[in-house]
Amino acid sequence: MTLYVLSKPILLHFLTQLRSKNIDQISFRKNLVKLGRIIGYEIVNTLDYESIDVETPLGTKAKGIYIYDLENILIISILRAATPFVEGLLKALPTARLGVIAASRKEKEVQVGYPEDIPVDVYYMKIPQVSHKDTVIIADPMIATGSTMRKAIKSIVNSQPKRIYIASVIISEYGLKRLMEEFPFVDIFTISVDPEIDNRGFILPGLGDAGDRAFG
């Protein structure tokens, strides 16, 4: 597993705005779109490519590259917080196929001090057929315990895609450790690794409930 913690100032600027309790709903969604787009381009930079020659309008040859992996991209969106985030990813990866997973936490069942016991109910899943040529990007802006992400990875891993990426904005140290131990073949792109999870399963310092802040 490779962990990419992206720390460009523009990314941290947008993240700081997202963390603030004073950001309005529309700006919150727009920032998730912006971050998704930039992270999408960062992912593209790691894809396989080949050198090619092209002919310019002036009849001369120019050397370039062709990123052939772009032809086989599948993005899986973890609803609902990932919706604007995936909108940004699709701006960087406009030919990607799209799947969705809808899940919810059963917060009333949470046990203090045992974040791994927070149950997750996956109540809808629609994912296109996955092949060994595919690069799969599972997108969830907030990864706390990693329970939903674990179920998403397990739903496609038996199809043996070429590679699996996780795209997020914030991931907790606990969720990161858990995913790295169970899925060492998955690469993770994020902007921040936050240190704590509270007994409701929210990341601290985090940015609150991303779904509620984006959609009310």
Curated annotation (Swiss-Prot):
<dbReference type="GO" id="GO:0005525">
    <property type="term" value="F:GTP binding"/>
</dbReference>
<comment type="similarity">
    <text>Belongs to the UPRTase family.</text>
</comment>
<keyword id="KW-0342">GTP-binding</keyword>
<protein>
    <recommendedName>
        <fullName>Uracil phosphoribosyltransferase</fullName>
        <ecNumber>2.4.2.9</ecNumber>
    </recommendedName>
</protein>
<dbReference type="GO" id="GO:0044206">
    <property type="term" value="P:UMP salvage"/>
</dbReference>
<keyword id="KW-0460">Magnesium</keyword>
<dbReference type="Pfam" id="PF14681">
    <property type="entry name" value="UPRTase"/>
</dbReference>
<keyword id="KW-0808">Transferase</keyword>
<comment type="pathway">
    <text>Pyrimidine metabolism; UMP biosynthesis via salvage pathway; UMP from uracil: step 1/1.</text>
</comment>
<dbReference type="InterPro" id="IPR034331">
    <property type="entry name" value="Upp_A"/>
</dbReference>
<keyword id="KW-0328">Glycosyltransferase</keyword>
<dbReference type="InterPro" id="IPR005765">
    <property type="entry name" value="Ura_phspho_trans"/>
</dbReference>
<feature type="binding site">
    <location>
        <begin position="140"/>
        <end position="148"/>
    </location>
    <ligand>
        <name>5-phospho-alpha-D-ribose 1-diphosphate</name>
    </ligand>
</feature>
<keyword id="KW-0021">Allosteric enzyme</keyword>
<dbReference type="InterPro" id="IPR029057">
    <property type="entry name" value="PRTase-like"/>
</dbReference>
<feature type="binding site">
    <location>
        <position position="80"/>
    </location>
    <ligand>
        <name>5-phospho-alpha-D-ribose 1-diphosphate</name>
    </ligand>
</feature>
<dbReference type="GO" id="GO:0000287">
    <property type="term" value="F:magnesium ion binding"/>
</dbReference>
<dbReference type="GO" id="GO:0004845">
    <property type="term" value="F:uracil phosphoribosyltransferase activity"/>
</dbReference>
<comment type="function">
    <text>Catalyzes the conversion of uracil and 5-phospho-alpha-D-ribose 1-diphosphate (PRPP) to UMP and diphosphate.</text>
</comment>
<keyword id="KW-0547">Nucleotide-binding</keyword>
<feature type="binding site">
    <location>
        <begin position="208"/>
        <end position="210"/>
    </location>
    <ligand>
        <name>uracil</name>
    </ligand>
</feature>
<feature type="binding site">
    <location>
        <position position="209"/>
    </location>
    <ligand>
        <name>5-phospho-alpha-D-ribose 1-diphosphate</name>
    </ligand>
</feature>
<dbReference type="GO" id="GO:0006223">
    <property type="term" value="P:uracil salvage"/>
</dbReference>
<dbReference type="InterPro" id="IPR000836">
    <property type="entry name" value="PRibTrfase_dom"/>
</dbReference>
<feature type="binding site">
    <location>
        <position position="203"/>
    </location>
    <ligand>
        <name>uracil</name>
    </ligand>
</feature>
<feature type="binding site">
    <location>
        <begin position="30"/>
        <end position="34"/>
    </location>
    <ligand>
        <name>GTP</name>
    </ligand>
</feature>
<feature type="binding site">
    <location>
        <position position="105"/>
    </location>
    <ligand>
        <name>5-phospho-alpha-D-ribose 1-diphosphate</name>
    </ligand>
</feature>
